[in-house]
């Protein structure tokens, strides 16, 4: 098997900027083919669940046999909502679920319009709170992939303590759960200018035997596959030789 390049975090609907229709999704797929991807995973935000057009997706799988297409969902994890989430997703068959933390309480900490909220926190306590939420998400057992593991750094507010110390119990929980961590290239285009997770966390993931997949977090067709080859090189340099892919919630590991 030749080089495997996957992009498992693609938002076909974006932030409701696109329609989940065959013509719109085809633009993403054709960009992926142009980027030499072997597999694309569409994973829109769960708030758009009712807007997903499953028939269009099945049609596109037939139309583009040269690339594997997978259908996932990125879910905003909220503590205490696990039962409701399970009931909500029960009627659907996804290939994988990404669990992500975008809110601390009601604060959307990664939204540029709400950066003033950082002033209310001690930066170490903020990181500790964030990673505690990631740990709860992991231990819920509802997800396959940890989305942008260290998203809390998005605006460049770095903790005083070692991030390995702050995230240590989270990484242990991920290891115990058998979940996969994505290397999400969107961080290179945020104020922090660093991939998620950073190199130190990725090295610890490798040491713990945590599998990885590759993701652009594209919200527009032109961003599909963006820096996926660069992320692959980073994973290879750390020591990874396999990449995780999913079908019907079952993980396989392919040569990286």
Question: Model-predicted segments: where are they?
Answer:
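Alpha-helical scaffold elements within enzyme catalytic domains, especially in hydrolases
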Residues: 31-34, 136, 173, 204, ...
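Domain-core and long-helix interface of multi-subunit machines
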Residues: 15, 51, 101-208
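Generic structural signal for residues in well-ordered beta-strands
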Residues: 69-71, 181, 243
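An N-terminally biased module of ancient metal coordination in phosphate/nucleic-acid-related enzymes
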Residues: 1-79, 83-84, 88-95, 145, ...
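Mid-to-C-terminal alpha-helical segments outside catalytic/metal-binding sites
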Residues: 226-256
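Residue-level detector of anion-binding/catalytic polar loops
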Residues: 38-39, 180, 211, 241
